[in-house]
């Protein structure tokens, strides 16, 4: 007799803050989501089975905005159980740099390039908090604390 136990575990995801270093003020890229939940968000997505977090981040950037990114650092982890209305996810957020012209692809309806003071006020998921934490880090070198 083999007993199979099934656990309900959070699903790992990655989000990428992509700074365009060949443009003034190092703006970041946001995508307008093609699928629900609709709205503006950081590029990112689910980690595939057998894939490292870093590989997932690079793949998602290529799939969503068509850019080859250079991962600079792992920024922070966001794990509030209600951060994603679809299911419980844990997001590992990376800061990356890129050059060139991003093009909306995959599940991105469109994309926008935003200077720090131009970020739209309402973003999907907890991405508004992520961007706010990133801007604090970018300007004051303060990492977000544990919540």
Where are the regions that the model predicts?
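NUDIX/MutT-family hydrolases
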Residues: 93-95, 103-136
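A short coil-to-beta-strand element that immediately follows conserved catalytic motifs
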Residues: 67-76
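Conserved Nudix-box catalytic region and its N-terminal flanking loop in Nudix hydrolases
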Residues: 24-64
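Active-site-adjacent beta-strand/loop module that shapes the phosphate/pyrophosphate-binding cleft
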Residues: 20, 78-102, 133-134, 138
């Amino acid at each position: 007799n083999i007993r199979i136990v099934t656990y309900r575990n959070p699903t790992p995801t990655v989000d990428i803050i992509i700074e365009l270093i060949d443009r003034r003020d190092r703006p970041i890229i946001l995508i307008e989501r093609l699928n629900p939940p609709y709205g503006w968000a950081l590029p990112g997505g689910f980690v595939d089975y057998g894939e490292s977090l870093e590989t997932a981040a690079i793949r998602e950037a290529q799939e969503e905005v068509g850019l080859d990114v250079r991962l600079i650092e792992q920024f922070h982890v966001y794990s509030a159980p209600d951060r994603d209305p679809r299911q419980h996810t844990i997001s590992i957020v990376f800061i990356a740099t890129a050059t060139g012209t991003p093009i909306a692809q995959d599940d991105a309806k469109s994309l926008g390039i935003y200077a720090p003071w131009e970020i739209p006020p309402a973003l999907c998921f907890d991405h508004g908090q992520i961007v706010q934490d990133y801007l604090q880090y970018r300007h004051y070198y303060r990492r977000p604390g544990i919540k």
